[in-house]
Every structure is written in structure tokens, then in C-alpha cells.
């Protein structure tokens, strides 16, 4: 008989863009696009991984963390 396994729910983080990428360095604009953000006040729920946390840290003045689960 096969074991019933539950997948552990991945931790998530919801971020909102609060700053405009206009007149920002190209690397910051690309980081926002990499996070799935490109317009003001858009929200995106992403997996909470070290790479995502690093991207958030790189543009922390342009985004805010809304929710962490």
C-alpha cells in the first residue's frame, strides 16, 4: 500500500511595487521585471526563496512586503 504524502506548502511572500522605475538604473528596472512587477501598486505572490529575497533586497526602496506565509 502506498503512503499518502502531503506536499509541504511552500512559503510565500507577497510584494507590492510602491516606487517608479523611471530614472532608476537599468539593473533595478530588470530586477522589478524579474519579480513580475512593472507598474505601480501591482502585487505579486512569489515563493519565499533566497534568490527572491535577494531581488527584493536589491530594490527594497521600490517595493514593500505585504504578506509573508
Swiss-Prot record:
UniProt KW Ribonucleoprotein keyword: yes
Keyword terms of this UniProt record: Ribonucleoprotein, Ribosomal protein
Pfam family name, one: Ribosomal_L30
Gene Ontology CC entries for this record: cytosolic large ribosomal subunit
Protein's UniProt keywords contain Zinc-finger: no
Gene Ontology biological process terms, A to Z: translation
Top-level taxonomic group: Bacteria
An MF annotation (GO) of this entry: structural constituent of ribosome
Assembly and interaction partners: Part of the 50S ribosomal subunit.
UniProt similarity note: Belongs to the universal ribosomal protein uL30 family.
Protein name: Large ribosomal subunit protein uL30
Annotated source species: Rhizobium etli (strain ATCC 51251 / DSM 11541 / JCM 21823 / NBRC 15573 / CFN 42)
Amino acid at each position: 500500500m502506498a503512503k499518502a504524502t502531503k506536499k509541504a506548502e511552500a512559503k510565500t511572500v507577497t510584494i507590492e511595487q510602491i516606487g517608479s522605475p523611471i530614472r532608476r538604473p537599468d539593473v533595478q528596472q530588470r530586477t522589478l521585471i524579474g519579480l513580475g512587477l512593472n507598474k505601480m501598486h501591482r502585487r505579486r505572490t512569489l515563493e519565499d526563496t533566497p534568490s527572491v529575497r535577494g531581488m527584493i533586497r536589491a530594490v527594497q526602496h521600490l517595493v514593500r512586503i505585504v504578506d509573508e506565509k
